[in-house]
Amino acid sequence: MHVLIACPYCPYPPSTPKHPKLPPKVKPPSTQPPHVKPPSTPKHPKDPPHVKPPSTPKQPPYVKPPTTPKHPPHVKPPSTPKHPKHPPQKPCPPPSHHGPKPPIVKPPHVPRPPIVHPPPIVSPPSTPKPPKTPPFTPKPPSPIPPIVSPPIVYPPITPTPPIVHPPVTPKPPSPTPPIVSPPIVYPPITPTPPVVSPPIIPTPPIVSPPFVPNPPVVIPPPYVPSPPVVTPPIVPTPPTPCPPPPPPPAIIPSPPAQPTCPIDALKLGACVDVLGGLIHIGIGGSAKQTCCPLLGGLVDLDAAICLCTTIRLKLLNINIILPIALQVLIDDCGKYPPKDFKCPST
């Protein structure tokens, strides 16, 4: 506020109108997006300062030891010449005035002996002393300032995804082939066939019994029946005028006909020999090659009966060889005799 002092001679100052107050300026809201700093790429770490390795002190210069002066040369003293020895002077006789003067006889000239110098003095060889090296005093190590390396900034580690291995399928075990040892082939034994005498059939008495037909032979299904045994009809003889005949004997029915081998059983001798050799080594390929061609034209039951007949002719143990023979028939030759087959009794 202005303080006005009333003064009679000072007019009132004119009142200046005040400027109207302007409304405050309102800044519009800034629509600029916020300033985003780009991600700072880590600076490569500076190479650490190269530190020179401590220098090894140089060796001190080689100081030659003082050389000892050689001995002064030996100076020979001057040789003093020897005085020649003068012969003693003979006293001269007094001169005689009356005779001629005798000749003056001079002493013979004696040559001077040569001057012989003494041998030179040989001094021993001087051995130089080894040089003395001063003791090595290493320099004190200079303090090395600590090496301050800038911190190494590693980039962020991004984990690698785990390695998924395919499932391991185990290999199927390889079947090992059975070890088949070659069968021992024995040479065929051809024994002499026993002399078979025909059975002696006694002639029955001539009786006129009533005709009894033979019962039919029961044959299994795969068996091809042999032709029935046709017996000739019994022709009764006319009665003789005899006394009354005795009572007729009991009628015994004839047994059924035994099946026989339709081929020569001796042809299967080689097959039975091979089967006899297979008791200890097991059934092999030789039995198939030997027996199957011989039994090819026979039916199942005939083949088994022929083997039984040949085993009996060979006088072998039928209880041991028959199971082997039946197994060869079924497995190798494709023949199927009746189940629980047994050789017919003779």
UniProtKB/Swiss-Prot annotation:
Domain of life: Eukaryota
Stretches the record annotates as Disordered: 11-144
Amino acid composition bias (Pro residues), ranges on this chain: 25-42, 51-81, 89-144
Pfam families registered for this protein in UniProt: Hydrophob_seed
Name the UniProt record assigns to this protein: 36.4 kDa proline-rich protein
Organism: Solanum lycopersicum
